[in-house]
Swiss-Prot record:
Record-annotated Pyruvate carboxyltransferase domain positions: 33-307
Region feature Regulatory domain, mapped onto this chain: 439-556
Superkingdom classification of source: Bacteria
Lineage of origin: Bacteria, Pseudomonadati, Pseudomonadota, Gammaproteobacteria, Pseudomonadales
E.C. code: 2.3.3.13
Subcellular localization: Cytoplasm
Protein name: 2-isopropylmalate synthase
PANTHER family (alphabetical): 2-ISOPROPYLMALATE SYNTHASE, PTHR46911
Binding, Mg(2+): 42, 246, 248, 282
Family: Belongs to the alpha-IPM synthase/homocitrate synthase family. LeuA type 2 subfamily.
Pfam families assigned: HMGL-like, IPMS_D2, LeuA_dimer
Alphabetically ordered keywords of this record: Amino-acid biosynthesis, Branched-chain amino acid biosynthesis, Cytoplasm, Leucine biosynthesis, Magnesium, Metal-binding, Transferase
Single GO BP term: L-leucine biosynthetic process
GO molecular function, one term: magnesium ion binding
Organism: Stutzerimonas stutzeri (strain A1501) (Pseudomonas stutzeri)
Length: 556
């Protein structure tokens, strides 16, 4: 079978909701929602190999450490493993006083009863129940009419309320999900939820959670936002319910749907870290939270060490996080492109540590989430001088002058083309050493002595060449002019730069010099030494030897 030429014969667009006065497009997210992690339930049930008790406990503690205050810990009526885990959390005293666990149950009395058994002794808990409301599920799966669906929700609600009243030692909260909400007629979704509201009689002090799942993502995010706004306008006792979002990523827009849903009036978000979950996954709580953070909104979740969180999630889920995954992937803060690298390097050089973040191509400061700057710029055959310069500055304190950046980038480009691989900062520095710092032929500096008197410098240098030691002497207005006068070749200094590497007693000096030999094209040299004069002399020898070597190659 192949793709259809006319897919409308098989698929139809989801109907839009008519809200001519919709308000969500002009809204902004200005505060964090209530967050619930479903990693231990929705995430866990989607794994090839579900977590054992030890992994679940490790994951739970990580969620608490991140700052999650509501955590769905399992489906205890459907799994003995989940039941035992809930008991261990409660009996082992693992639940902090400010954290509420949530469990899921189907709308059946035996399963609800088993659920309450699992929660015995909990200080506080949310009982979350659901039944499917979408037309296709009513017709195909359950053969139920609308009245039958409402009756299921109401009957289950009454059982839950009764069992809660029989166990007053726990501070109970309740959540209802019209499953497949995003494919349910809006009027019917409100009708079912209003019937549930009548059962629980919520108040502004004791709110009922109405969770509105895009169980299967069926439309563009703006349609989901319209559904949420319409629901918020028409539901009874809006001040006594928390409207919760539970999006999936079947169309790849779970994050966008969640953000627009919050703009449309929702109060709460359910999801999983890094988007684990059924099929294409639940919404990624990390991405939603850090999207808020980069807009200046405190998400009230702490991802200061995002790689440690990722390590736990990968090991417990036995699934890798994609290298391009927002914020946490190995490559998301990495630039290979030369123009991108140049912009990033300039951004870092001008960034005010206490000012607004304005580094191009980086929507977040990697340091805020525990990332180093080492991986921000990586060099391959697509890279330019900006990336090379950045790595040398960050890792070795080497600040190449602009024209030298261009010259050395050609050296690196030639090497990356030869290797066909990425080059690390260490490899780039080794190339710099080989090209400039080890340019000791045909003349190797063995030593020098400088005398200065009345504004005149006299320099004596000891040089090794062709197995012999020779001496040069020159006089000039400064050490470099004196050295140029001593050289056996006609050398013209075009440019000179110097700076310190490091600080304090261990600091070294770096000198960069650009010379022209016999009127040929300019070339550069580098010298590094504890003494700035020695560094300058080494730089001149480096440039001279490189120029002589290239002249010899050209003649050959």
């Amino acid at each position: 079978m192949t793709m259809l030429k006319n897919p409308s014969n098989k698929y139809r667009a989801f109907p839009a909701i008519d809200i001519p006065d919709r308000t969500w497009p002009s809204k902004a997210i200005t505060q964090a929602p209530i967050w619930l992690s479903s990693d231990l339930r929705d995430g866990n049930q989607s794994l090839i190999e579900p977590m054992d008790a030890a992994k679940k406990m490790r994951f739970f503690k990580t969620l608490v450490q991140v700052g999650l205050k509501e955590i769905e810990v399992g489906f205890p009526s459907a799994s003995q493993t989940d039941f035992d885990f809930v008991r261990e959390l409660i009996e082992g005293g693992h639940i902090p006083d400010d954290v509420t666990i949530q469990v899921l149950t189907q709308a059946r009395e035996d399963l609800i009863t088993r659920t309450f058994e699992s929660l015995k002794g909990a200080k506080q808990a949310i009982v979350h129940y659901y039944n499917a409301t979408a037309p296709s599920f009513r017709r195909i799966v359950f053969n139920q009419d609308k009245a039958g669906v409402i009756q299921i929700a109401v009957n289950a609600g009454r059982i839950i309320k009764r069992l809660a009243e029989q166990n007053p030692e726990t501070n109970w909260r309740f959540e209802y999900s019209p499953e497949i909400f995003s494919s349910t007629e809006p009027e019917f979704a409100v009708e079912v939820c209003n019937a549930v509201i009548e059962v629980f009689q919520p108040t502004p002090e004791q709110k009922l959670i109405l969770n509105l799942p895009a169980t299967v993502e069926a439309a563009t995010p703006n349609v989901y936002a319209d559904q949420i706004e319409w629901f918020c306008r028409h539901i009874d006792r809006r001040d006594s319910v928390l409207v919760s979002l539970h999006t999936h990523n079947d169309r790849g827009t779970g994050v966008a749907a969640t953000e627009l849903g919050l703009m449309a009036g929702a109060d709460r978000v359910e999801g999983c870290l890094f988007g684990n979950g059924e099929r294409t996954g639940n919404v990624d709580l990390v991405t939603v939270a850090l999207n808020m953070y980069t807009q200046g909104v405190d998400p009230q979740l702490d991802f200061s060490d995002i790689d440690a969180v990722r390590k736990v999630v990968e090991e417990c889920n036995q699934l890798p996080v994609h290298p391009r995954h927002p914020y946490v992937g190995d490559l998301v803060h990495t630039a290979f492109s030369g123009s991108h690298q140049d912009a990033i390097r300039k951004g870092f050089s001008q960034q005010d540590p206490n000012g607004l973040w304005e580094v191009p191509y980086l929507p977040i400061d990697p340091a805020d989430i525990g990332r180093s700057y080492e991986a921000v710029i990586r060099v391959n055959s697509q890279s330019g001088k900006g990336g090379i310069t950045f790595l040398l500055e960050q890792e070795y304190g080497i600040s190449l002058p602009r024209r030298m950046q261009i010259e050395f980038s050609q050296v690196v480009q030639k090497e990356t083309d030869r290797l066909g691989l990425e080059m690390s900062a260490k490899q780039i520095y080794a190339l710099l050493e080989a090209e400039y710092l080890q340019a000791t032929a045909p003349y190797t500096l063995k030593g020098h002595r400088l005398q200065e008197e009345n504004g005149t410098s006299a320099v004596d240098v000891e040089v090794a060449a062709d197995g012999e030691v020779i001496h040069w002497r020159g006089i000039g207005k400064g050490p470099l002019e004196a050295l140029v006068a001593a050289l056996p070749v006609k050398l013209e200094i075009m440019d000179y730069h110097e700076h310190a590497i490091g600080a304090g007693s261990n600091a070294k000096a770096a000198a960069y010099i650009e010379v022209r030999l016999d009127g040929e094209r300019p070339l550069h040299g580098i010298g590094i030494d504890e003494n700035i004069t020695t560094a300058s002399i080494r730089a001149l020898f480096s440039a001279m030897n490189r120029a002589l070597h290239q002249a010899q190659e050209a003649a050959a």
